[in-house]
Amino acid sequence: MGIPVFFKTLITDYQNVIEPVDGQKIDNLFFDLNCLLHPSCASIKDGNEDSMIQKIIADIDTLIQLTGATFVYIAIDGPAPKGKMMQQRVRRLKSVLEEKVWDTNAITPGTNFMNRLNDELHQLYDGKSNVILSDSLEPGEGEHKILQYMKQHKSVL
């Protein structure tokens, strides 16, 4: 779970913490795809899920190209522990009351949208030796999956 407005606060109030890489290559790119899912989906105003999936894939490809990463680990939030499920349910029920073209509850493990996204990402990345995808069917939050992978493979990172 992210910290609301954290990144925006960092780049606004502490501009010196971010430096351009100026052509430096990044060996390992780890990212929690949920940080990309919401803005990518929100940018598709008509709520077309096919367009959303294509936008997500295009955004992933852009990130990989911009960084020049030789290894990529993509983590998507999986089913949450029971304690967090109630918190998520309350938050999502509140968001349903807002009028939206597309219901962001679809960005939940087990929904048709997430299953389709998982399938598309597996088709793209399963044969690639330099990309690992931990999809939304694997339990755990994206950032926890990333940290677990890093701990298990620290000798090669």
Residue ranges: model-predicted function:
Residues M1-L157:
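Noncatalytic, typically N-terminal accessory segments of nucleic acid-processing enzymes
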